[in-house]
Swiss-Prot record:
Family recorded in the similarity comment: Belongs to the glycosyl hydrolase 42 family.
Known role: Specific for beta-D-anomer-linked galactoside substrates. Hydrolyzes o-nitrophenyl-beta-D-galactopyranoside (ONPG), chromogen 5-bromo-4-chloro-3-indolyl-beta-D-galactopyranoside (X-gal) and to a lesser extent lactose. Hydrolyzes p-nitrophenyl-beta-D-galacturonide very slightly. Does not hydrolyze maltose, sucrose, raffinose or melibiose. Has some transgalactosylation activity yielding galacto-oligosaccharides (GaOS), including O-beta-D-galactopyranosyl-(1,3)-O-beta-D-galactopyranosyl-(1-4)-D-glucopyranose.
Name used for this protein in its record: Beta-galactosidase III
Organism: Bifidobacterium longum subsp. infantis
Protein keywords: Glycosidase, Hydrolase
GO BP terms: galactose metabolic process
GO molecular function term, any single one: beta-galactosidase activity
Pfam families recorded: Glyco_hydro_42 (PF02449), Glyco_hydro_42C (PF08533), Glyco_hydro_42M (PF08532)
Taxonomic lineage: Bacteria, Bacillati, Actinomycetota, Actinomycetes, Bifidobacteriales
Length: 691
């Protein structure tokens, strides 16, 4: 799959390259007399780019065929003359009320047949030819009007596709799904084979009999092959819509373009890796997860975004200065986290740090969502932090950070959107296992052992790493299977977990015992699964291992171990369970490489405790013992080595003391002792040095 050529928004004429800094700006929500104050405050904060007109369709086209760009012209002119570039939105994120009144057929339909009414956002369906015509018309009008504007440096196409309209079960979608299946499979017999329709008398005679996976009754089970393809189709339908908008803009005004993804550990709405091939530069919206996993999940998501971008620079298009508005409890950021979180994304490869939004709304559904200028105004800690961050970003740019990229790790944790979709089905061995949790646990456990891993999509170049983790990768296609086998045979070091290689890319089980097509690579054969839980008293709710760890939720029944393999850890259990002394963790020699197999869900803590022995078995070196796990070290460097930056993040609630090598550039909640070449990094603190 080919990537579009990478294109990055360039600075305004006469300006030098900077780390792009600010985010969504919604001047149409405020009286015009506020605009001049906004621009002055932006200059004070070091802002150099804003995204404008994302949800402005009703103001850009107040009546059908009547366009008003005058207000937007004035905004862009004020910004540009102040040295602030514009990432201009297509304006098509949500249709105006006049359109939905005239054309209710553009509204998406849920699986029970209920129509999504206007009143919020993103109530349009991706397969509506009517809505597509309106959207493309606005794109062309925007492109024509702003094609020669010197202050517009990039296109922001729509917004967070699929956030609310991921699935549409309308008649438009039904016809599009039929065409998608015909293109993918060619014949209806091939569809029947792929979906296993011989089961439950679901065989179809022609493509017109294909329908979306609508409501089938409470407690029933949808055909899993069909459901997996439906998720693929839904992602592709939105992708096709985006590409149509993109092409309409670029045909007239060929500026760098993007659309904002929603990459996080648990957000798998679309196949963002596939989408990443069709943008000029990757951009992402990330909102922190409150609690003890806050930093680790954020770092993981940033690493995955970097993997989707194939280590090209990427935009952090949205994150928050503090609380969001859409959780049951909207926790604020702790002191220091505004700066630390932004620098974490920067460390992981982002060359743009942007927020939702510039000025906190005084009305509307997101009025309680934090912003760079909060309700309290510029005399606030949030705005002071915003200004501090702006100065830090300018300093790092002056020191040459923009010439660097995230330094490649020795370990790649593989992530697969389709494996997550497959594990979401309601008829699986257990509902407690989902693909997305295991990569995050491995990322955290590796960090506990001094290794900051890269997170690489399954289509990505993971086989170029010294070591690779396949964490509950339920789907192993024939192509991926070949890559795995070649990787280990040629000397690769592989970690494989339970729930990996169960099915192929049609969701058909690999027969002969698990893990399917790579049993000989890992050197074990699993005959059966042993899910665990607390809902049936008298059954197993956990399993102890003889290395001091505990398995929960899931374990493999490993019935044979190859002569080329040896057991690293075994289960300790009552005789009645059949698990006492059974293999739990093994290492196998395969070709010139080694493959470790972890046959149970150990969680972050169990993995962290098991990894030292496994890392030693596979010959993978880790960091010094004295700071293991307390501090995350991330490096950015250029190809020449002239510019090399080290970011040190305290991921604990205690002060972390580290040795300092190089020149300290940014110290947020960190005190540097220059005479002793050490630094004390406070909780939520970060230190950036240049080697």
């Amino acid at each position: 799959m080919e990537h579009r050529a990478f294109k990055w928004p360039q600075p305004l004429a006469g300006n030098k390259p900077r780390i792009w800094y600010v985010g969504d700006y919604n001047p149409d929500q405020w009286p015009e007399e506020v605009w001049d104050e906004d621009v002055a405050l932006m200059q004070q904060a070091g802002v150099n780019l804003v995204s404008v007109a994302i949800f402005s369709w009703a103001k850009l086209e107040p009546e059908e065929g009547v366009y008003d760009f005058d207000w937007l012209d004035r905004v862009i002119d004020k910004l540009g003359k102040a040295g602030i570039a514009v990432d201009l939105a297509s304006g098509t994120a949500s249709p105006p009320m006049w359109m939905t009144q005239a054309h209710p057929e553009i509204l998406w339909v849920d699986y029970r047949g209920d129509v999504c009414q206007p009143g919020a956002r993103q109530h349009w369906r991706a397969t509506s030819p009517v809505f597509l015509d309106y959207a493309l018309n606005l794109c062309r009008k925007m492109a024509e009007h702003y094609k020669d504007n010197p202050y517009v440096v990039s296109w922001h196409v729509s917004n967070e596709y699929g956030c609310h309209n991921r699935f549409d079960y309308s008649e438009d979608a039904e016809r599009a799904f039929q065409k998608w299946c015909e293109k993918k499979y060619g014949t209806i017999d091939a569809v029947n084979d792929a979906w296993g329709t011989a089961f439950w008398a679901q065989r179809m005679n022609n493509f017109s009999e294909i329908i979306p996976p609508r409501f089938i009754g409470d407690g029933n089970f949808m055909n899993p092959g069909k459901l997996l393809d439906w998720k693929r189709f839904s992602s592709d339908a939105l992708l096709d819509f985006y590409k149509a908008e993109r092409d309409a803009l670029l045909e007239i005004a060929p500026k760098p373009q993007t659309t904002n993804f929603m990459v996080s550990a648990g957000c798998t709405v679309l196949d963002y890796d596939k989408w990443g091939h069709d943008v000029d530069f990757v951009s992402n919206d990330h909102y922190f997860s409150p609690g003890e996993a806050h930093f680790d999940e954020m770092a993981y998501a940033a690493c995955l975004t970097d993997g989707i971008a194939r280590k090209n620079p990427w935009f952090l298009m949205e994150h928050s200065t503090s609380a969001v508005n859409w959780r049951p409890t909207n926790y604020r950021l702790e002191p220091g986290e505004l700066v630390r979180d932004s620098l974490a994304h920067l460390a992981m490869g982002a060359d743009a740090i942007c927020y939702f939004q510039w000025r906190q709304s005084k009305a509307g559904a997101e009025k309680w969502h934090s912003a760079m200028v909060p309700h309290a105004g510029p005399d606030s800690q949030i705005f002071r932090d915003v200004c501090e961050l702006g100065a830090d970003l300018n300093k790092l740019a002056d020191e040459g950070l923009l010439s660097t990229k995230l330094v490649k790790s020795k370990v790649a944790v593989v992530f697969d959107y389709e494996s997550q979709w497959a594990t979401e089905h309601t008829a699986t061995p257990t509902q407690e296992v989902r693909h997305w949790t295991e990569p995050l646990d491995w990322f955290r456990a590796l960090a506990d052992n001094g290794l900051t891993a890269d997170v690489v999509p399954v289509r990505g170049p993971w086989d170029e790493y010294e070591a690779v983790v396949l964490p509950s990768l339920a789907i192993l296609s024939e192509q991926t299977t070949r890559r795995v086998r070649e990787y280990v045979a040629n000397g690769g070091k592989l970690f494989v977990t339970y729930y990996t290689g169960l099915v192929d890319d049609r969701d058909h089980v690999w027969l002969g015992g698990y893990p399917g097509s790579i049993r000989d690579v890992v050197g074990v054969r699993v005959e059966e699964f042993a899910p665990m839980g607390t809902d049936a008293p008298g059954t197993m709710d956990h399993l102890d291992l003889d290395n001091g760890t505990v398995a929960h939720d899931f374990a493999d029944v490993i019935t044979s171990v190859a002569d080329t393999a040896h057991v690293v850890a075994s289960f300790k259990a009552d005789k009645w369970t059949g698990f006492d002394g059974a293999p739990a963790i093994t290492v196998n020699d395969f070709g010139d490489g080694k493959a470790a197999y972890v046959g149970a869900r150990l969680g972050r803590e169990g993995l962290a405790k098991s990894l030292p022995a496994l890392l030693e078995e596979l010959g993978i070196e880790t960091s010094a013992e004295d700071d293991r796990g307390e501090v995350v070290r991330v490096e950015r460097a250029d190809e020449t080595g002239e510019n090399h930056f080290v970011f040190l993040f305290n991921r604990t609630h205690d002060v972390a003391v580290v040795d300092v090598e190089g020149e300290p550039l940014v110290a947020s909640l960190a005190q540097v002792n220059e005479s002793e070449h050490t630094a004390a990094i406070q909780p939520n603190g970060v230190l950036v040095v240049k080697l």
